[in-house]
């Protein structure tokens, strides 16, 4: 990425974050960090709720190229009107399943980054923990 392209992406993301109500200075610092890193990787929250652990266990058996993730804003969510759900599905599957949510403090950033499809990574329990987790990566 050239210096000019990088500046353009920082300006675009920074202005989108500012439009979503973030402090202008903080928005541009956050945009610069995200663009320099080449994107953003976030842990999906709420993966231990309901039958989501069973869904993650099953997703872990698929090749990553067969799994697709979609980020869906949920303005009618009673707990958080800014919530962004992480919906997943498999190739030739029966629709999408809500795997969890983007962390509350990053929802505005994810919305500002636009409708890019994220990459999903299922991670198994670490340090002896039996639970599965998931991470989504968004490229700039």
Regions found by a protein language model. Give the residues of each.
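Short intrinsically disordered terminal tails
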Residues: 1-3, 139-140
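IQ-motif-like calmodulin-binding regions
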Residues: 4, 8
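Conserved active-site motif detector
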Residues: 9-20, 25, 29-140
């Amino acid at each position: 990425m050239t210096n000019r392209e990088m500046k353009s992406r920082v300006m675009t993301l920074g202005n989108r974050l500012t439009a979503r109500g973030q402090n202008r200075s903080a928005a541009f610092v956050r945009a610069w960090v995200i663009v320099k890193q080449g994107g953003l990787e976030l842990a999906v929250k709420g993966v231990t709720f309901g039958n989501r652990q069973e869904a993650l266990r099953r997703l872990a058996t698929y090749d990553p190229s067969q799994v697709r993730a979609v980020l869906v804003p949920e303005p009618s969510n009673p707990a958080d009107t800014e919530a962004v759900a992480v919906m997943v599905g498999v190739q030739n599957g029966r629709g999408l399943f809500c795997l969890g949510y983007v962390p509350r403090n990053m929802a505005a950033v994810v919305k500002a980054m636009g409708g890019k499809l994220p990459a999903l990574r299922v991670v198994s329990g670490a340090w002896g923990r039996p639970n599965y987790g998931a991470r989504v990566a968004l490229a700039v």
